[in-house]
């Protein structure tokens, strides 16, 4: 299946994603229903599934309108709320075969306690919501957020094949790289990508695979990068370094 990406240019800098082939469509975390409906109608597709990574408002606001148009579409989510009820409740390890494609579910709490991601192995794509961003990770401001769970979830993601491409829900490239450079100012990867993306529109920013993400993401590098021991000598690599970096990023 092909993957269509839109940038909404809103205050939260949301990306929106749709997977499609000649007949079928799958929507991920719809905020604006109209962009999906227009594309689906133009290409004469059938919306088969709506996948929800977590129940924050900017990931579910468009669900109700899409279901009013596409009566046969099924919602897949870990849990629901007042705005939507899943047709299929998913959990860690759930495998869903839609016939025209399939995906596996990973439970990755931390940003919020109901967070999952969707791994499309045939497409080599991971829709990771607000857990992993380009050069960063999700925040822990929600009531059910847990920084230690976020670390464990990140470790889980890093164990996937390196050629899989993560598709995050927001464009936070520049802010994340600026933070990383505030810790490791001379790092070649951080500087290279900062220069690469500085002049690019959000629609044109690169989609890198997990192997490359591991090099440009300071939170992944917190697991093993000895350069961080020089920058933050009071903290050991792994969970302790990750927690410290996430705390510093909160106030950056």
UniProtKB/Swiss-Prot annotation:
Its organism's taxonomic lineage begins at: Bacteria, Pseudomonadati, Pseudomonadota, Gammaproteobacteria, Thiotrichales
Q: Which UniProt keywords apply?
A: Hydrolase, Metal-binding, Zinc
What is one GO biological process annotated to this record? methylglyoxal catabolic process to D-lactate via S-lactoyl-glutathione
The EC number of this protein is 3.1.2.6
Q: Which protein is depicted?
A: Hydroxyacylglutathione hydrolase
Required co-factor(s) are: Zn(2+)
Q: For this protein, what reaction is catalysed?
A: an S-(2-hydroxyacyl)glutathione + H2O = a 2-hydroxy carboxylate + glutathione + H(+)
List positions binding Zn(2+) 2: 58-59, 130, 170
Q: Which SMART domains match?
A: Lactamase_B
Q: Whom does it interact with, and what assembly results?
A: Monomer.
Hydrolase in keyword set: yes
Q: What does this protein do?
A: Thiolesterase that catalyzes the hydrolysis of S-D-lactoyl-glutathione to form glutathione and D-lactic acid.
